[in-house]
Amino acid sequence: MSNKMWGGRFTDRPDAIMEEINVSIDVDRHLYAQDIAASKAHAAMLAAQGIITANDAKNIGKGLDTILSEIGAGKFTFKRALEDIHMNVESRLAELIGPAAGRLHTARSRNDQVATDFRLYVRDVLDETDAALAAFQFALAERALEQADTVMPGFTHLQTAQPVTFGHHLMAYVEMAARDRGRFQDARKRLNESPLGAAALAGTSFPIDRHATAQKLGFVRPMANSLDAVSDRDFVLETLSAASICAVHLSRFAEEIVIWTSPLVGLIRLSDKFTTGSSIMPQKRNPDAAELVRAKTGRVIGALNGLLIVMKGLPLAYQKDMQEDKQGAMEGFAALSLAIRAMTGMVRDLVPEHDRMRAAAGEGYATATDLADWLVRTLKMPFRDAHHVTGRIVGLAAKQGLALHELPLAEMQAVEKRITRDALAVLSVESSVKSRTSYGGTAPKNVRAQAKAWLKRLEKERKLG
């Protein structure tokens, strides 16, 4: 005869392999706080509706508080034989308060119970991620304001393209993080409905108040369809999707840090706090933190892909496949959290090599577009013609191994006789970045204004939050 809490129907014990594949406590034990909170809300509602007595609800609440304290203090023994967090908590509750513990599961199934727990868990993840990204943005904006005048090369195809400011580059990631936060915040809005009370799939015949439990747990409303409530994990998928996009942004920045810290490039330095050495090469300073951020992106994207594959063929309602929704997601969320914190630390730590940045900004004829723009503005030349003329001038300079501003004026005039000495003034990298005053451009005054605006906005969020 089965000794399981669901075992009344069964006459034989599960096979040992069945026990092994069925158990989930190693993963869902991380839902203990959410499980206890949902159970307390459910018990209070049952009493308010006259389904259980007020005294039973009181004892259930006290017992659950004791269990919460035991788990928090590391004094709770999780038992694999009890399968999951729900049964572990209920079993311990029975030890503490006796038969009244058996009334807790009235009008509830593990199907709506776990859906509620996981929504609460993911909601906490969303809030923590939003706060971490806000701190990342603040660090970026602070450094951007500090480095608003620092000229560096801007790249396309990893080739020098046009001069930009380091502050402008950092502010690009502030904007990306803002969109990431928007996606997480939007996901939270759709997540924030309560499955509790949907029971196994069809609802319950007991006169429960789902609005009361939803309100108690901070949800906006109960989910409107009991089948939907227990059978979908789109809230996890949406969060992992937003997490994957965010991780890609972090990975791109991490890749830049890896490139920029290479002695062959040398645009920035990281301190010993975010680098490691080699076991054989004593001179090495490796940007391991950035490399690991880059790698952890795969963990996040892998979690999304894994859950998509789990869910893609499941008919309604609950299927045991959905027990596999948590481990990958939890690992993905943890990887993203660590990556955000590591990138925030590196942003605060990195030191720009100003001289090297300035020199690199002028390499590769990076101010050629400024010359083309001068031809358009001053000589009223169509841009396509100006592009062609400038390309010929760049070719002359390259053939002689000269920077653009080093090419004699006479040779420029051999290509376009109307070019004057005034054109030389636009060829410095400082002049180039200062001229990019269009909205969103790299001009230092733009960067300062944007960085200050973001710092003010983020500080206001801190005070309100």
Curated annotation (Swiss-Prot):
InterPro entries: Arg_succ_lyase_C, Argininosuccinate_lyase, Fumarase/histidase_N, Fumarate_lyase_CS, Fumarate_lyase_fam, Fumarate_lyase_N, L-Aspartase-like. It holds the Pfam family Lyase_1. One of its GO terms (biological process) is L-arginine biosynthetic process. It is an enzyme of class 4 (lyase). Its main location: cytoplasm. Disulfide bonds: none annotated. Its EC number is 4.3.2.1. The keyword Amino-acid biosynthesis applies. One of its GO terms (cellular component) is cytosol. Pathway: Amino-acid biosynthesis; L-arginine biosynthesis; L-arginine from L-ornithine and carbamoyl phosphate: step 3/3. It catalyses: 2-(N(omega)-L-arginino)succinate = fumarate + L-arginine. It is found in: Cytoplasm. One of its GO terms (molecular function) is argininosuccinate lyase activity. Keywords: Amino-acid biosynthesis, Arginine biosynthesis, Cytoplasm, Lyase. NCBIfam families: argH. Belongs to the lyase 1 family. Argininosuccinate lyase subfamily. PANTHER family: ARGININOSUCCINATE LYASE. This is Argininosuccinate lyase. The gene is argH.
